[in-house]
Amino acid sequence: MTLTKHTKRLIHAHAKICYPAECCGLIIDGQYYPCDNVAPNPAEHFEIDYLNMVEMQEYHGEIQAIVHSHPNGNAEPSEVDKVQMGLHDIDWVIVGLGHTPTGATYCDIKRHKPTTYQSPLLGREYYHGVQDCYSLVQDYYSRDLDIHLPDFHRTDGWWEKEHHLPLYENNFT
């Protein structure tokens, strides 16, 4: 997959519109498709609705890359990005967009190939559902004990909802 100047312009324009929140989108058959960021805190993370991804793939073809921006950051993957890239096993395009101390705007767009990445057990970046307390336990059991615990979707704050299903009980029995 090649990032054309036209595609980069579309991604840059979308990142500017979404700023200071993270933009996100998909590249399918060389075309950029902006997506809504449905993350609980879009200024710090991005999330593309899974059903939206499936629908886009049905109508437009195979996803070639996942795109998102790092407002006031660089175009290098964060620790959470590295974990996710390995799980999705497709390219990621990251946009660093912001302002320099002199007030000038900068934009850097880079494509990254997926690699297998394991976060350190200590000092890892926290993000619920990706690198949270449960994923720490999963990683420890997998690396040190060769026991593979199941993964399951968990929304942030589920434990505060009175009538929420007991995730751990339901997923371990």
Residue ranges of model-derived segments:
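Residues at alpha-helix termini
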Residues: 88, 144-145
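Conserved beta-strand-loop surface patch within small alpha/beta domains used
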Residues: 1-65, 72-114
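Active-site nucleophilic cysteine motif
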Residues: 128-144
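Short acidic alpha-helical/loop segments enriched in Asp/Glu that coordinate divalent cations
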Residues: 146-158
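Eukaryote-biased recognition of intrinsically disordered, low-complexity regulatory segments
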Residues: 113-121
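Second-shell loop/turn segments in exported
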Residues: 121-127
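Residue-level recognition of short, structured coil/turn motifs
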Residues: 20, 145-146
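...with weaker cross-activation on analogous glycine-rich loops/strands in unrelated enzymes
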Residues: 156-173
